[in-house]
Amino acid sequence: GKLIGTPEYQMTAPVWMRGILGDQYGIKSNEIRWRSGGQEEAGRDERTPFEAPPGLDLEPIPEDRTLVEMFEAGELDGLTTAREPSSYTMRKPNIDRLFPDFRSAEKEYYRETGIYPIMHLMGLRKDLAEKHPWLPGSLYKAFVESRDIAYQDLAKTAALSVALPWVAA
């Protein structure tokens, strides 16, 4: 029954984080008490409305508080966020990663499962694909071309231009 903060329970990164914790470590989402709210700024509104399913303990934090502030005060046991909290980057006492050697843990997870956690995906409505049969293939080609341009840009600099954790692996 740990108390864990997250900007939005339904955000992409916390979704796959919960999946990994469940699949790899047997920690079920409904065994955790969840609190949602602004990570660094108070009063954050959810971008996507979400109603927690029965059995899930999910409540918003007070509007005048932030997740980081509550975490630093010991009112939350942990955070699941897409961005490092300032309390971690500022090396506040008693604040650390769940996996201190996270790069090795991430690589090992990929080696074991073959899964690279995604952030976003694109979908196409079936009625549009049926009405315009050329559309799925054209969208696919556009994304492949975009990816190829991005890969070319990666080779142009001596410093990483993206935050892909395993780009050098």
Task: Go through the PLM ranges and name each one.
Residues 152-169:
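An extracytoplasmic/periplasmic, membrane-proximal ligand-sensing/linker region
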